[in-house]
């Protein structure tokens, strides 16, 4: 079975790298918006009291701008299909302390990926072509074999 796909891809993404925030704090916000529509996501992010809401809001807005530019799609048809947060690099500093000692400070960063999908461009628009194929010979070494363990004595034939 062969598929002829349209040139338009139904997904666009926005990637934010090296955002100075813990990945766990960003995941708390990302889990609330995953799978929701674009307009509903913007309302949720505007009212959320967390600091992670603003960078994620900017990424969702940027992904919607990418969708309207590349696919000429309407914002009402966009849904967040995938949203993930990965840990980024850790910035390590030293803070001077008493008696000439130093104290390490670790600033964590994260990478956030937002993928928007246009639900008006669905997979049902792809055309499937079933072409007749010549039957090919199967190799015996790679073919799957069925072993009947019950009639051949099974695993417990020796004691």
Curated annotation (Swiss-Prot):
The gene is rpl22. Coiled coil: none annotated. NCBIfam families: rplV_bact. GO terms for cellular component: chloroplast; large ribosomal subunit. Part of the 50S ribosomal subunit. It is found in: Plastid, Chloroplast. It holds the Pfam family Ribosomal_L22. This is Large ribosomal subunit protein uL22c. It comes from Ipomoea purpurea. PANTHER family: CHLOROPLAST 50S RIBOSOMAL PROTEIN L22-RELATED (PTHR13501), LARGE RIBOSOMAL SUBUNIT PROTEIN UL22M (PTHR13501:SF10). Keywords: Chloroplast, Plastid, Ribonucleoprotein, Ribosomal protein, RNA-binding, rRNA-binding.
